[in-house]
Amino acid sequence: MLKAVLKKSREGGKGSKKEAGGDFGSETPALSSSGDSPVNSLSTTEDTYRVSLAKGVSMSLPSSPLLPRQSLLTQSRSNKKSPGPVRKPKYVESPRVPGDPVMIPFGEGSKPSEPSATEAKADNEPSCSPAAQELLTRLGFLLGEGIPSATHITIEDKNEAMCTALSQGISPCSTLTSSTASPSTDSPCSTLNSCVSKTAASKSPCETISSPSSTLESKDSGIIATITSSSENDDRSGSSLEWNRDGSLRLGVQKGVLHDRRADNCSPVAEEETTGSAESVLPKAEPSAGDGPVPYPQSSGSLIMPRPNSVAATSSTKLEDLSYLDGQRNAPLRTSIRLPWHNTAGGRAPEVKARFAPYKPQEILLKPLLFEVPSITTDSVFVGRDWLFHQIEENLRNTELAENRGAVVVGSVGFGKTAIISKLVALSCHGSRMRQIASSSPSLSPKSSDPTQDLPGTPLLSPSSSTSALSVTRTPAGPGTADSQRPREDAVKYLASKVVAYHYCQADNTYTCLVPEFVHSIAALLCRSHQLAAYRDLLIKEPQLQSMLSLRSCVQDPVAAFKRGVLEPLTSLRNEQKIPEEEYIILIDGLNEAEFHKPDYGDTLSSFITKIIPKFPTWLKLIVTVRANFQEIISALPFVKLSLDDFPDNKDIHSDLHAYVQHRVHSSQDILSNISLNGKADAALISKVSSHLVLRSLGSYLYLKLTLDLFQRGHLVIKSASYKVVPVSLSELYLLQCNMKFMTQSAFDRALPILNVALASLHPMTDEQIFQAINAGHIQGEQGWEDFQQRMEALSCFLIKRRDKTRMFCHPSFREWLVWRADGESTAFLCEPRNGHALLAFMFSRQESKLNRQQTMELGHHILKAHIFKGLSKKTGVSSSHLQALWIGYSTEGLSAALASLRNLYTPNVKVSRLLILGGANVNYRTEVLNNAPILCVQSHLGHEEVVTLLLEFGACLDGMSENGMNALCYAAAAGHMKLVCLLIKKGARVDHLDKKGQCALVHSALRGHSDILQYLLNCEWSAGPPQPGTLRKSQALQQALTAAASMGHSSVVQSLLGMAEEHEIEVNGTDTLWGETALTAAAGRGKVEICELLLERGAAVSRANRRGVPPLFCAARQGHWQVVRLLLDRGCDVNLSDKQGRTPLMVASCEGHLSTVEFLLSKGAALSSLDKEGLSALSWACLKGHRAVVQYLVEEGAEIDQTDKNGRTPLDLAAFYGDAETVLYLVEKGAVIEHVDHSGMRPLDRAIGCRNTAVVVTLLRKGAKLGNAAWAMATSKPDILIILLQKLVEEGNVMYKKGKMKEAAQRYQYALRKFPREGLGEDMRPFNELRVSLYLNLSRCRRKTNDFGLAEEFASKALELKPKSYEAFYARARAKRNSRQFLAALADLQEAVKLCPNNQEIKRLLARVEEECKQLQRNQQQKQQGPPPAPANDSDNEEDAPASSLKDHFPIEEAEEEDTSSQEESISPTPRSQPPPSVPSPYIRNLQEGLQSKGRSASPQSRAGISKSLRETVAQSGLVMQPTKQAQIVKTNQHLGSGQSSMRNSSTKIQVSSQNPPPSPMPGRVSAAPAVSRNQHLEGTGPFTAGTGCGHFGDRLGASQSLQLQRSESGTAYPLPSKVKAAERLLAHASVAVDMAPPNQGGPVSCSDVRHPASLSSSGSSGSPSSSIKMSSSTSSLTSSSSVSDGFKVQGPDSRIRDKGTTQVQGGTAEHRPRNTPFMGIMDKTARFQQQSNPPNRSWHCPVAEGLLTNTATAAGLQSNSEKPTLKPGGYCSQAKPCSVPPLSMGVHNGAQVKELEENKCQIPALCQDNRITKGVPHLYPEGVSKQPLHVSTEAHRSHLTSAKPKRSFIESNV
């Protein structure tokens, strides 16, 4: 039989299993087949899948929720087709199913996939980021696409390979399916067998849709559970895969494998706290091999707790497997409260889309179990019980009551206990959880739902919960009037408002009955309680708390996990008043159910609560329910007991039952008609029937519910007044229901195997799993799927399908009725669970893939329970135990791993463990805990005597050691297990064995204070003679034990050891060979005052030092134990005793920062002034270690503050070295010398910089520390320090600026600029650039104050290059330009500033002034057309600016302007830019625009107005920006505008307009359209020129103006030089014509305007297209200047101006210029610094490009023909002017460098330089040097004749 079952039925048995390579569930196309069932080539139909189920293909039984579900075997083994749709297998071991997508999209069957191909791919595919995965997953749900399941791994590799929780990288925390998440079959959290059908038809009840939330909701799968590679059976019934509301299965996200090596340091150490098993809370996570993030590692170990009937053994899933829990968590009640929106058939629900929460991973990794109570449905009504809630409330509020820690509701089966709990949950903050898992009530099939949980459950879900509009209605039968009921009804709401967590125990779902899951789930629910939001926040902030609550930690030490992870944090939060001062309640239902799974070792839920309740804070209460016949399990709880059993006596119970019957009768016409004899039901009849039913019920709501259900469905009709037809008990009700369902015995026999399997299973099973189990018992003639479905349908009223597609018994009482009957009751329909165990065992045995640890434990459990070989031993001669061992050995290869699984270690199942060992498990197998200790060591540590005996019986090695060298005896001695120590010694364990720390068992017992074990070990035989390696003599061990006991404060052990001193050669002053301590130094260092006193009394020497030479006094002082110090001083120690380094106890205490010890020592006369061998005092040591309180105390006590050591270091030096700024500040304030230099030349500041102590650097600088060369040298490559030092320089400059010392301020700024680091700091350069901007602005203000307007403008432009959006820089530059009379350019800058900071009033004020000045200029120009206007007074502004203080605020521009003797000082601070910058030009600007209209008119004075108008309009249209280059602007300061230039300016405007259409570029100097218009209007339309302007000057000006245009062009791209040259050549021809035609102007000389007009005509033609326009990039890289600005130019410009002096009006008020020889900020040219200090009265603004072109023209034509007085040398003039037409200009050039560079770079071009080649090369030769060369002009000569344009200025100051 065994052979047949194991071999034949498995078709290939082990062989095929091995061939599969251990990929459980791997879908290999070629399966070995047995002869009778030919292999069907990968048939993907549902039928074949069913067949494979029938054949026993690999499918895991429902197992621990810990484990992911096992995937279904894929190929069917026979050709038979099973009609049912198939559910796809959920992979047990691995989170990812190799072949198919885990989920079948809602309602769609997943497409068949080629398993082997997919399988190979699955493991190798890299996963995308969790966020992306989550998104894809969600899209998949929305679009109905399947999502690939997680990778799978071979099972046996599971020992170390554990799956982690993120399959596919999906975030485990997503709240995809609201908060109730249960793992998908694929998820490690799910315990269901994975059996998602490959082609599940949409109607298939089995099809699953996975939604990524199982583990999505909690990362626990990671923390707690690394799933062993074996998929533990996912079916933990409670965990049932979590289904979406639409019935879709949630995908568990487990992915990746990780070898989790737990760091369990349980080995004892000489520490105060013994390390508990909880230490190994967080295993080290190794990167998972799979794709996808690996949250927390878990190690594998089976962890299921045994129950009396070995259930726990079967649950031994590996701890890692605990991820199963994840699936369970988050679930609401264990009630299936079926709400209408839940489709039990698993179809697609309409609200799927609405439920997708925004993707945001949760940080909480804990997940509550998913509870479903099948009996609570939407048609359940909850009536009454107000009296009960009222009593509970009163008792819990009664503070005087000793039993007010909680309440126990006691009642018999079916009395409504679960419904009471569910009612409270439904009204609590977790009510939504309950509603989420509710499903619609299964049609009207007679459902024996538990009233206990159900009846009282209508509004159970709260009124909104169900379609059956059953609300909490009170019938007249209810007790009391409405008034009296009011407070009672309030009681339930009050209690519900206090509920923060809940738990349901269900016997048929093992995991709900285990303590670790209880702790983890309660913690997860507490996090989700809105009253305890602070607790959630705390867990997020402190991940170690979450790891303490991980399932792994809960398995290892549930008491410590609950205490440290829940109770202590809650208490501390309450003390901090972060939790409201209220009482809170935890609900626990059905404690008696948990007793069914009582482990061999460890607590049941009731014993755990009894143990932990004393640690509960008084404000945290429990309400628990228990059956009346199990009251003894809660007898020790300090709870008030409320009984539901005193039925006849308690009128409230009577009233509740009546109210329920009345409610049901009145709400159903069917019941009314069936209880009336004549079809009429009057009140009296109803009352009579009600009384009869209530009397029969004996208080059971379940009885009433089931009976009224029969009336409602017409199965019972009252025929006589005797009511004989009404069943009298629950047993009769169940018998009646079964008789109605199974009319014949054969009908019941067909259903019997299904019931047997359901009774035997540890978890709820899906239909596929049950189908597989049923067929596992057949070798031939398997049951068909359709036939099976019919049988399941017949049982659907007894086996309720839950939302996760698993089946649970309708009520615990029905389950019990099927197995057991009271005496005298009918035995019909009794079931035999043993047969169910056999079928489940066969199912596991026939599974093709390897069994994981969890499944192996379950297989052992079922084999033992089935006991199929009973009675065969006599026939076969082989004992049944050996046959069972043979069975399990043939069925799985993971026996050793299962034996060492985590749960089987901490809550071992002894019987299953014995079976595993008999089957061949290795008793010396290494575990994953206690440093990979062998099983014997772990069991010795845990004190499991029975298991240790079992292991020793089978030959476990006594000398087996963990990685730290401890053997079983050491662990037993350290843990204090006396019996195990005796057992191990008797079996031959070595007493003198040393671990890797050199400690023997004797020392371990002494460290932990186990004197009885120490005595026992001393009496054992120790090896005589010289100790062997790894051993030691007894005397050495005793000396070590004395030191160990003294250090830990175990006085009883010390006394007993000292009592044996003579007998065993123990010396009280001896040093041990292990730590080198004496007993007194060890005790003193640990602060054990009592032990010190004891040792001193026994003769310990006060001055005896340890092996390192440290006396007891120093040990105590170093650790701050002043009480021990006092004791030792009292016993004669010298307070100023010094050690080998000359240090005193005071120095040691100061060094460690123990203030109380320092105070005590000083009070005892310790010397403050004593120095050690290095010259350090106590104060020096305190400063060196940064103990501010000690420093302060010592200084106050008179310590010398400037005491130097042998290296010349003072305490301040040492404090600066350490880096505590407050200590440094304190010392400085107390008079420490801040500039003290030690022997190495270092000052405190240098030390702080060297150590990068920025806070100290800042403090010292504030206190006046000087910056020397050493400081700058130390700051090299330390950007954070360097920026502080530079800011210090800026602050010094700012102080001088405010004092009016402009020169000194500029020097500081300049010095700071020299100290800037070179490029290369990357991101660190940002703050430096900000600071550089600040410095440039400060320098700009300084130069403006000293009337160096050109430099002021230049520095502002530099600031703009670094920070193009700086409104302060625009403002500063506008101020400089305005001072140099460049009103239009100033206007443009101000408009940019207004754009950037529209609300700044100061900018607006200045803008208004400049606009007014422009209008005035326009009026002056018009007047000048008739004659030279009088020179206006110099309008220079005096400003008081506060320099920029830091790189963050370039100090508000505090620029005060004095206009006409009234000075204003206002700061421009950044203001919100809410208003857009003004885009409408001012009236003045509009007037200017009108002048741009006529483009080709004659330039005679009469037509100037029209030309200017046309120019203005053109400019306005093109949005050009006219801002002169820096050189041009500076030159303009000294130039006066001639009246005859406007026409030529107009023509040049046209050129500029065409060239300025490109989009604005972000360069600092550019301005956008609106400001551009106004600027152009100033430039072009204004500025009358005096009649006598010389053409030479005009040419100069044109060169400058061209450079201006070139630089200011908007496009930012430089056109090639040849086009410029050509344009210039074209202009030459026109120029000569213009000279000839020009009519003489007033005063004789030819007006420049006359010359300009023809050029304008010609240039206008060429300027129409961008290609011919002359436009240059303004970037600094294209900076060029005319190479022709030579010395000759410098001479002739002034020459001509001087000659014209008679016709020119000289502007007065020129400031005195003091040329410099030294460069200023790299600017060598004096012209740049001086030239702008006098402001010419009238200036005409013109288009730079055109004027530049005209310059060439005029030059070529020979301006000598002009009737101007001076005769210019053609060559000289050409060399000056011509190059100006070509080179591009940029704003970023330093003025000072221009002349110098030009001269060095062959700037001087021969006299008649008309060859364009030279000019072509210039831009490339001089990119920077030439851009800013102002026309060299004398401030005294012909100011009114000078054009405002300036050629590249390389000379200026020489003529000033």
From Swiss-Prot:
Acetylation: is it a keyword of this entry? yes
Q: Where is the composition biased (Basic and acidic residues)?
A: 8-21
- Alphabetic keyword roster: Acetylation, ANK repeat, Phosphoprotein, Repeat, Synapse, TPR repeat
Q: Locate the N-acetylmethionine modifications and list their residues.
A: M1
Record field: compositional bias (Polar residues): 29-45, 203-216, 1490-1505, 1524-1556
How this protein is processed and modified after translation, per its record?
Phosphorylated; by MINK1 and TNIK upon stimulation by RAP2A.
Q: Does the entry feature the keyword Cell division, yes or no?
A: no
Bias (Acidic residues) ranges: 1454-1463
Q: Where is the composition biased (Low complexity)?
A: 60-77, 439-475, 1417-1426, 1656-1686
Renumbered residue ranges of the record's region Disordered: 1-45, 58-130, 203-222, 262-296, 437-489, 1417-1597, 1636-1720, 1832-1856
Q: What subcellular locations does the record give? A: Postsynaptic density
Positions annotated as TPR repeat? 1286-1319, 1333-1366, 1368-1400
What cellular-component terms does GO give this entry?
axon terminus; dendrite; neuronal cell body; postsynaptic density
Give one GO biological process term.
dendritic spine maintenance
Instruction: Please list the residue ranges covered by the ANK repeats.
Output: 893-925, 931-960, 964-993, 997-1026, 1037-1066, 1075-1104, 1108-1137, 1141-1170, 1174-1203, 1207-1236, 1240-1269
PANTHER family tied to this protein: PROTEIN TANC1 (PTHR24166:SF23), ROLLING PEBBLES, ISOFORM B (PTHR24166)
Family in the record: Belongs to the TANC family.
Q: How does it assemble?
A: Interacts probably directly with DLG1, DLG4, HOMER1. Interacts with DLGAP1, INA, CAMK2A, GRIN2B and GRIA1. Interacts with TNIK and MINK1.
Question: So what does this one do?
Answer: May be a scaffold component in the postsynaptic density.
Q: What is this protein called?
A: Protein TANC1
Which species is this UniProt entry from? Mus musculus (Mouse)
Q: Gene name on record?
A: Tanc1
